[in-house]
């Protein structure tokens, strides 16, 4: 879909760039596939802020998207429509099976209403189809890739994202991610063919602070602009640089400090995303 710019009749419209969503369905979602979504405002069950700079925003309805694709195997479904989903950057597709059952899936690029999609052990390499990643040919572009068999897609789910199959060995598939990381995924893990829809999401410009507030994002304050009681970078006469390496409000090093500690899955990462920066 194309980008949409506006005539600068107001200051906020001058910078505004949005994705043109005229081709999407304009009605409400299927009620049976939705549920209520309560906003936490960044607070936990004690009412304390656990994630700063969140709160407000437009009320949302949660669409139940099928990330597993393991029901109705080998049964072709018809794409009814492509819809907007306020809870994610990608678009979603409503599919209908011959028995009348419906579900939402992540919409890949080049998927249109009326197309047929199928999930099964051996499927054609066609956008929207899903199956074991080990049965797909090397070079295939995939999204919504499972990391654990049957748990549901975890990799490459946001707008425009994808991973590429670059090899196969001993029941595992080598994936190259957009970050540059190469990792092993079990061949029985499901993946969907194609790249995720809405690749122009990266080019939007919100144009004004209020549009960020509609998304539930509150103003982000710098530590050096605070008092010493509020942040390790706070205080000082006049403007200061913080006087130390960047840290979080709780004194933990940040801005480049490696935090990964999951050694259990290190063997599955063949090439780190940090290697290409060296």
From Swiss-Prot:
This is Large ribosomal subunit protein uL2. It comes from Methylorubrum populi (strain ATCC BAA-705 / NCIMB 13946 / BJ001). GO terms for molecular function: rRNA binding; structural constituent of ribosome; transferase activity. Belongs to the universal ribosomal protein uL2 family. SMART domains: Ribosomal_L2 (SM01383), Ribosomal_L2_C (SM01382). Gene3D superfamilies: 2.30.30.30, Nucleic acid-binding proteins (2.40.50.140), Ribosomal protein L2, domain 3 (4.10.950.10). Pfam families: Ribosomal_L2, Ribosomal_L2_C. Keywords: Ribonucleoprotein, Ribosomal protein, RNA-binding, rRNA-binding. Residues 212-221 have a biased composition (Basic residues). It comes from the Bacteria. Part of the 50S ribosomal subunit. Forms a bridge to the 30S subunit in the 70S ribosome. GO terms for cellular component: large ribosomal subunit. InterPro entries: NA-bd_OB-fold (IPR012340), Rib_uL2_dom2 (IPR014722), Ribosomal_uL2 (IPR002171), Ribosomal_uL2_bac/org-type (IPR005880), Ribosomal_uL2_C (IPR022669), Ribosomal_uL2_CS (IPR022671), Ribosomal_uL2_dom3 (IPR014726), Ribosomal_uL2_RNA-bd_dom (IPR022666). GO terms for biological process: cytoplasmic translation. One of the primary rRNA binding proteins. Required for association of the 30S and 50S subunits to form the 70S ribosome, for tRNA binding and peptide bond formation. It has been suggested to have peptidyltransferase activity; this is somewhat controversial. Makes several contacts with the 16S rRNA in the 70S ribosome. Residues 212-278 are annotated as: Disordered.
């Amino acid at each position: 879909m194309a980008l949409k710019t506006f005539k600068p009749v107001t200051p906020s419209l001058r910078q505004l760039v949005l994705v043109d969503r005229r081709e999407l369905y304009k009605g409400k979602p299927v009620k049976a596939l939705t549920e209520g979504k309560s906003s936490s405002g960044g607070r936990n069950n004690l009412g304390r802020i656990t994630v700063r700079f969140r709160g407000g925003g437009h009320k949302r309805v949660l669409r139940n998207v099928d990330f597993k694709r393991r029901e109705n195997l080998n049964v072709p479904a018809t794409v009814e429509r492509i819809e907007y989903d306020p809870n994610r950057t990608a678009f979603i597709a409503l599919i209908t099976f011959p028995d009348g059952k419906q579900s939402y899936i992540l919409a890949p690029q080049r998927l249109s209403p009326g197309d047929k999609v199928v999930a099964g052990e051996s499927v054609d390499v066609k956008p929207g189809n899903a199956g074991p990643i080990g049965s797909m040919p090397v070079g295939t572009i995939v999204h919504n890739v499972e990391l654990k068999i049957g748990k549901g897609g975890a990799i490459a789910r946001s707008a425009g994202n994808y991973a590429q199959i670059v090899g196969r060995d001993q029941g595992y598939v080598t994936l190259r991610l957009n970050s540059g990381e190469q990792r092993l995924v079990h061949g029985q893990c499901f993946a969907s063919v194609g790249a995720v829809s809405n690749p122009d999401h990266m080019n939007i410009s919100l144009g004004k602070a209020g549009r960020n507030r509609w998304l539930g994002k509150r103003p982000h304050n710098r530590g050096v602009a605070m008092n010493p009681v509020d942040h390790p970078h706070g205080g000082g006469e006049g403007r200061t640089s913080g006087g130390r390496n960047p840290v979080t409000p709780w004194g933990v090093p940040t801005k480049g400090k490696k935090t990964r500690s999951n050694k259990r899955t290190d063997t599955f990462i063949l090439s780190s995303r940090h290697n290409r920066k060296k």
